[in-house]
C-alpha cells in the first residue's frame, strides 16, 4: 500500500499538485491523526499523517487525484471537563474542504457522545470530503470596485430569488447559474443595484430539530464547511464552483459586485447534544470558547461560539475569507453576528481577527459589513467596529418605522438617522457609508408585512409562535393580514412609498431586501429561516410592477443627488443639506423635539423632500424658486410646478428646482 510522505505544513486543506495531494490539519491537542481515504467501492484506507510541524499535522499521498474522497480520524483525550472531546470512531470533515460528498442527516451515529464517548463507527454514513482541482478561466474579469458612496445593496437568497422566475430556464432556477442569467442581470441593472449580497452560500446543514419536524434550514446560517459551496444551489455538485464563478464573472461584466454573507461565529455542531461533524472532534478546546466546566459559551444563540482570538482559528478564518476573494473573486462580506469576531472575550477593536484583516493586502481592499452584535453581555456594538467596516444600522430601521408607522419619533431623531446616524458613526475617520441603512432584511418582516401585520405569525416554524422578535414597529393600518378595501390598500401603499423613499434618499449606504420592490409577503412570518417554500420564494408573477418602477426611479434619483453620493459628512452651511419647517424656515429647537411631523429636507440646494407625517392634509410652503415634482412622484412629461404643496396625510413628495 502507498505510504504517505511527510509533505508540507501549508497551505491548510487538501491540495493537488499534479503528482499527488498534500494534506494538512490543525490540532494543538491531538495525539495522532489518521487520513482516511475511500475508494470507489466505499472501502476505507487509513494513513497516519507523518508530519507534525508545530500544531499542524501533514502528509503527502503520491498518485492521489482530484475526486478522491477523504476524511480524518483524530486521536486524543476524552476529557469533557477540560474541553477535549476526541473520538477516533467518528469520521471528521476537513475544515478547509472545498467539496463535500454526502448529506448531513439526523443520525445518532453522527453524535460523539455527551458525557461518555459514543464509540460506534460512523464512516458508512458520514459525509466525505472531496479533493478538487482548481482550473478556471476568468478571462478579463475585474472587480467593479463601486465607490461606497454609489453603492446600492440588494440582499437576496440564491434559491428564493430565482426559483419561481418564469423567464429563467426551469433547469437552472434557484441555482448559482440563474444569478448570472441575462434576465436576472438585466433586472438588477434596471433596478439600479450595484451590489448583490447573497445569504450564505458556504455549505450548511439543517439542524436535527428541524429535520425531525420535516423542516429544513433555508437561510443557511448553520455552517459545516466554510470553504465549500452549498451543493443544493448547483445544477451539479461537481460543477458548483464553476457555476458560481460563471455567475460572478457575468455580474462583474454588468458592473455588479457580489457580497457574501458569511458565518464565522458558530458551527453546525451546535451545543454538546448536537452532531459531531468536524471542529469538535479535531480540537474542541482551540476552535470554541469553552467555559470552566467544559461546556460552550453560547454567545450566538446557536449552541457554540468560535474562538476567533485563538491564533490558529484566526488563520483559519483569514484563509477562508482570502479563498472566497482570490478563488471566487467576491467583492466583500457581510459578517453574521460580527461582534464575535472582536471577542477576546471582551469586544475589542484591535482583536486578532480585525488586525489580521487590516494587515491583509487582499481582505483590506474589499467591502466589509458587520452585523454589529451578538447575544452575550456587551454584545451590542453598533458604531464600534474598526474603520474598515461598515455596519448594519438598526437605529435607522427602527427610526424609519417608528416615524412612519408608529408616529412617535421626534423630527430631530428622524433627521439624525436620515443623516447617516452621525452621532453613531462619525468617529475614527469613518465616512457616512459606514452606516448600512435598512428598513427590512431577511431577518424580520418584509416591507409589505410591516404595513399589513401588527403581530408576528410564525406558527409554521413549529415553535408555537415563540420565535422571532416582538419588536417590529409595524402597523397593519386597521386590519391584520394582506388584502382589504381599496382605501386600506392605498394607505398601505403610501406607507411603503414613504419607507422606501426614506431608505433610498437618506445619507448612508442603502440595503434593499429582495422582494420588497415587488410587494412580497411572508404572511406575517418574521423568522422564516426554516421555510424553504412559497412563503419565502419570490413570486415574480405576482410582483407589483408599479412598486418596482417606483423603487427603480428612487434609486436612479438618488444617483443624481451629490449630497448622497459624495460620501462626506454634512456640515452646517456646506450646501449639502438644509432642514426646514412647513413654512420653509429653519426649525427651532422646540420644533425639532416637539413640533408636528412636518419637515422639508433640501439636498444639494436643488432637490427637496417634503414630508407630512401627520394625520391631516397640510399646506407645505416650499422654499423660494420654481419647483417641480419629479419621478417617481410625477411623470417626466407633466411635472407639477408649485410653490405650495398640499401634503396628504402620511405623505411625501420630491421636488427639483
Curated annotation (Swiss-Prot):
In residue numbers, the region (Disordered) covers 460-481
Read off the SUPFAM superfamilies from this record.
(Trans)glycosidases, E set domains
User: What's this chain's function?
Assistant: Removes maltotriose and maltotetraose chains that are attached by 1,6-alpha-linkage to the limit dextrin main chain, generating a debranched limit dextrin.
Q: Which UniProt keywords apply?
A: Carbohydrate metabolism, Glycogen metabolism, Glycosidase, Hydrolase
Asked whether the keyword Hydrolase is assigned, the reply is yes
User: Active site at which residues?
Assistant: 336 (nucleophile), 371 (proton donor)
Q: Which organism is it from?
A: Escherichia coli O157:H7
Question: In which pathway is this protein known to take part?
Answer: Glycan degradation; glycogen degradation
Matching InterPro entries:
GlgX_C, GlgX_Isoamylase_N_E_set, Glyco_hydro_13_cat_dom, Glyco_hydro_13_N, Glyco_hydro_b, Glycogen_debranch_bac, Glycogen_debranch_GlgX, Glycoside_hydrolase_SF
Q: Which reaction equations make up its catalytic activity?
A: Hydrolysis of (1->6)-alpha-D-glucosidic linkages to branches with degrees of polymerization of three or four glucose residues in limit dextrin
Q: Where is this site: Transition state stabilizer?
A: 443
The protein in question is named Glycogen debranching enzyme
What does the similarity note say?
A: Belongs to the glycosyl hydrolase 13 family.
Q: Name one GO molecular function term.
A: glycogen debranching enzyme activity
- EC code(s) of this entry: 3.2.1.196
GO BP field:
glycogen catabolic process
What top-level class of enzyme does the UniProt entry assign?
Answer: hydrolase
Amino acid at each position: 500500500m502507498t505510504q504517505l510522505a511527510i509533505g508540507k505544513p501549508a497551505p491548510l486543506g487538501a491540495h493537488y499538485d499534479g503528482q499527488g495531494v498534500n494534506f494538512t490539519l490543525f490540532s494543538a491537542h491531538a495525539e495522532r491523526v489518521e487520513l482516511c481515504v475511500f475508494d470507489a467501492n466505499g472501502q476505507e484506507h487509513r494513513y497516519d499523517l507523518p508530519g507534525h510541524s508545530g500544531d499542524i499535522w501533514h502528509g503527502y499521498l503520491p498518485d492521489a487525484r482530484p475526486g478522491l474522497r477523504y476524511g480524518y480520524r483524530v486521536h486524543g483525550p476524552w476529557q469533557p471537563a477540560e474541553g477535549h472531546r476526541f473520538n477516533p470512531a467518528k469520521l471528521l470533515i476537513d475544515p478547509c474542504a472545498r467539496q463535500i460528498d454526502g448529506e448531513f442527516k439526523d443520525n445518532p451515529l453522527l453524535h460523539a457522545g455527551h458525557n461518555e464517548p459514543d464509540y460506534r463507527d460512523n464512516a458508512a454514513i458520514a459525509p466525505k470530503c472531496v479533493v478538487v482541482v482548481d482550473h478556471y478561466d476568468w478571462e478579463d474579469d475585474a472587480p467593479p470596485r463601486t465607490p461606497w458612496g454609489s453603492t446600492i445593496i440588494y440582499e437576496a437568497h440564491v434559491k428564493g430569488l430565482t426559483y419561481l422566475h418564469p423567464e429563467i430556464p426551469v433547469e437552472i432556477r434557484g441555482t448559482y447559474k440563474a444569478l448570472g442569467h441575462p434576465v436576472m442581470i438585466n433586472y438588477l441593472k434596471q433596478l439600479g443595484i450595484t451590489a448583490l449580497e447573497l445569504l450564505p452560500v458556504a455549505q450548511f446543514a439543517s439542524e436535527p430539530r428541524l429535520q425531525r419536524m420535516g423542516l429544513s434550514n433555508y437561510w443557511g446560517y448553520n455552517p459545516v464547511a466554510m470553504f465549500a459551496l452549498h451543493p443544493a444551489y448547483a445544477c451539479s455538485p461537481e460543477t458548483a464552483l464553476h457555476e458560481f464563478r460563471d455567475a460572478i464573472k457575468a455580474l462583474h461584466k454588468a458592473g455588479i459586485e457580489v457580497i457574501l454573507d458569511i458565518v464565522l461565529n458558530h458551527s453546525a455542531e451546535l451545543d454538546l447534544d448536537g452532531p459531531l461533524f468536524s471542529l469538535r472532534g479535531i480540537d474542541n478546546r482551540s476552535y470554541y470558547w469553552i467555559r470552566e466546566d467544559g461546556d460552550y459559551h453560547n454567545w450566538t444563540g446557536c449552541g457554540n461560539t468560535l474562538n476567533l482570538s485563538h491564533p490558529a482559528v484566526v488563520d483559519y478564518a483569514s484563509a477562508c475569507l482570502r479563498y472566497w476573494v482570490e478563488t471566487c473573486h467576491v467583492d466583500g462580506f457581510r459578517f453574521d453576528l460580527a461582534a464575535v469576531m472582536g471577542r477576546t472575550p471582551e469586544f475589542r477593536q484591535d482583536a486578532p481577527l480585525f488586525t489580521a484583516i487590516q494587515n491583509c493586502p487582499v481582505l483590506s481592499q474589499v467591502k466589509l459589513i458587520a452585523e454589529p452584535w451578538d447575544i452575550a453581555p456587551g454584545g451590542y456594538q453598533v458604531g464600534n467596529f474598526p474603520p474598515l467596516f461598515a455596519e448594519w444600522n438598526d437605529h435607522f430601521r427602527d427610526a424609519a418605522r417608528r416615524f412612519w408607522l408608529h408616529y412617535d419619533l421626534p423630527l430631530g431623531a428622524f433627521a439624525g438617522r436620515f443623516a447617516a446616524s452621525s452621532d453613531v458613526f462619525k468617529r475614527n475617520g469613518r465616512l457616512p457609508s459606514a452606516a448600512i441603512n435598512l428598513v427590512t432584511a431577511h431577518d424580520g418582516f418584509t416591507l409589505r408585512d410591516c404595513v399589513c401585520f401588527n403581530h408576528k405569525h410564525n406558527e409554521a416554524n413549529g415553535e408555537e409562535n415563540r420565535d422571532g422578535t416582538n419588536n417590529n414597529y409595524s402597523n397593519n393600518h386597521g386590519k391584520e393580514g394582506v388584502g382589504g378595501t381599496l382605501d386600506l390598500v392605498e394607505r398601505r401603499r403610501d406607507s411603503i412609498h414613504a419607507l422606501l423613499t426614506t431608505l433610498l434618499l437618506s445619507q448612508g449606504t442603502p440595503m434593499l431586501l429582495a422582494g420588497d420592490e415587488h410587494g412580497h409577503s411572508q404572511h406575517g412570518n418574521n423568522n422564516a429561516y426554516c421555510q424553504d417554500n412559497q412563503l419565502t420564494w419570490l413570486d415574480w408573477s405576482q410582483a407589483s410592477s408599479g412598486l418596482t418602477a417606483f423603487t427603480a426611479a428612487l434609486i436612479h434619483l438618488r444617483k443624481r443627488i451629490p449630497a448622497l453620493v459624495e460620501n462626506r459628512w454634512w456640515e452646517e452651511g456646506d450646501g449639502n443639506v438644509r432642514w426646514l419647517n412647513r413654512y420653509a424656515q429653519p426649525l427651532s429647537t422646540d420644533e425639532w423635539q416637539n413640533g408636528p411631523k412636518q419637515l422639508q429636507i433640501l439636498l444639494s440646494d436643488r432637490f427637496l423632500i417634503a414630508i407630512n407625517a401627520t394625520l391631516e392634509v397640510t399646506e407645505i410652503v416650499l422654499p423660494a424658486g420654481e419647483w417641480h415634482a419629479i419621478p417617481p412622484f410625477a411623470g417626466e412629461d407633466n411635472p407639477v410646478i408649485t410653490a405650495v404643496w398640499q401634503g396628504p396625510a402620511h405623505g411625501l413628495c420630491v421636488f427639483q428646482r
